[in-house]
Amino acid sequence: MNYQRSFEDLEFNAIKWWPQELSATVAEASVLPILISSQDLFISILKLSGTHPEQIFDVINAAQISANLFLKHLVVLADYGGEMIKRLGKEFQEIFPRMDSTLEYYMNYTFKGEQYTYIFKKLPIKGLDNSKLAIDGKAIIEIKPLSDLYRDMIMILLYGSTTEQFNLAGLEKCEIGTILGKNEIIYTYITQKYLYVSRITNGANTNSLGQIAQTYVCDILSKYLPNDYSVTRNGKILLSDLNSQDSTKTSFDILVEFADKKVGIEVSFQVTTNSTIERKAGQARDRQNRMHAHYYWIAYVIDGAGNFERSGAVRAICRYSDCTVAYSESEIAVLAAFIQEKFNA
């Protein structure tokens, strides 16, 4: 078998998105990739909802987007986090008035210069928080219908800034309804907001997502390799510097060892493009040369839609890799076969 894949071969075998069995774990570590992958659909819903203030509910249903995911988009854009949602729940009865006849809570708001009234269908409820709304962690991947609670929260996040109570519970942030149907403004507003959010959260998320990616590969390798093979995350090998007499410990995402034989493995799974793959590509030639000088081997597990957008970097890695595979179990099994072939030679 030819383990030295071309870019085209690797992409053909790639899965591009996180495997289903990891989706809950990944969602718990970071909701950002989920938001970005559904961003175009979210933008389309806002663009198509400019005729009347509650048209958005019809569009949400037609788009078949989960209500909690749509709400999460609004929460992120409004920067209306968990503490504010809790505060809204606790102060709801003090913030919004009630109908004299029915005692229902309501909200007077403005849409395109006209006054409207929304009667709350579910709020207030006890213990309003992110968990009840299923917008945090692994709950974000659950499919939730557009219930009365979601309708109430969506209306607040869209139009809260236009109410008389805008200065209470952070409602001044809830302004997205003012741009519904305004296509160019929507696109600029959302992309700028997500760029800001991405900068804040992506660094923190990259490490945890990288650990998830490495652990998954380790688990599958351990399943396919003999028990007397050592499979270690963040393993180090003492390698000679080819330009001097010095030796340094070089880290690999995963290190597989048996007797005096070693395979260093680098793992990169990026749904959204970033510079990690460029860094690995820049090191690829030197790392392979140093490993080969000790009669060791280097392999790469490369996947994710973001990585394949940086084709030059992936091509460089393929050129200086002894075995390159994608991220599915069947692909990692190919890597296991490569390791056994080398160790048994």
From Swiss-Prot:
GO molecular function terms attached to this record: type II site-specific deoxyribonuclease activity
Assigned EC number: 3.1.21.4
GO biological process: DNA restriction-modification system
Enzyme class: hydrolase
Disulfide bonds: none
Catalytic activity annotation: Endonucleolytic cleavage of DNA to give specific double-stranded fragments with terminal 5'-phosphates
Keywords on record: Endonuclease, Hydrolase, Nuclease, Restriction system
The protein's name in its UniProt record: Type II restriction enzyme HgiCI
Annotated organism of origin: Herpetosiphon aurantiacus (Herpetosiphon giganteus)
